[in-house]
Amino acid sequence: YFGESTKRGSDCIGQYGEGLKLAMLVFARLGMDVVIKNGANETWKPSLEKDKLGVECLTLDITPASRKDGHFDVVINDINEEAWDLIRSWFLRLTPAAVVQKTSYGELLDDPEFTGKIFVRGVYVCTRPKYEFGYNFFRVETGRDRQIPSSFDINFSITMIWDELAKRGDAATHKQLYKGLASEAAENEAFDLRQPDGLTFAMVSEFKKEYGENAIPVSSTSEGSDLEHLGVATVPLPQRLVSMLRRTLPSPERVRQDHAEKIVARHALGELTKEERANLDYAFRKLE
């Protein structure tokens, strides 16, 4: 019996119970030599035959078998090297990335060959140009036909993956994430609506390592050009990264305000000249 999925709630990729039937139909239409070893007792061969109305239908030629194991195997014969290379690229199980950062929401694929490639539970879905990394999402849904996931789902998963990686405290990973934000990679749009605390703190730490404690981020060279005389260095960066860093670091306006309110020196009342004392008394009277 087939035609119903038993994979729900398991670690298997399938869900709707139609994948095998559709695959057999494609194989039959292409005239490919496919043998399906269905457990220990049966062998299936898909083909197309016409029914009484002359309509081509998918049929299965089922023959008895006697195998020691009860495995379910699909054997596709006569695949050329070019087709095999293409098929391998669709599955991370067959072609794993060289460097993988795994989290509970998915994997960040830090491998030039996988840059921009989007996988869902190990199966290739699409390519996103200008991404800094590739991704294998665990909790994104693609639907029965494996459509491209929604941008919201992708962006949410990216923020969660980056946040988990940032919280691990690995210096090399922090540097890679900071590089991605500083390079205006396309996945940075994920942080327009959500900037996780763990990632923010890690990026602030990377910023201070590179530019020092007296530096602040700005979105243009003119934004903080008047702060140099205060001993403050301004660093032009992409707006999204500036927005994230300013959750902790001050803006130019805040630096100016703090400087204006800063006490430069303290003087005892007896140290004032007669003129300074007169000015102070005048100021107090105005406040009464």
Describe the predicted segments one by one.
Residues 1-78, 82-83:
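GHKL (Bergerat-fold) ATPase N-terminal catalytic module, capturing the glycine-rich phosphate-binding loop
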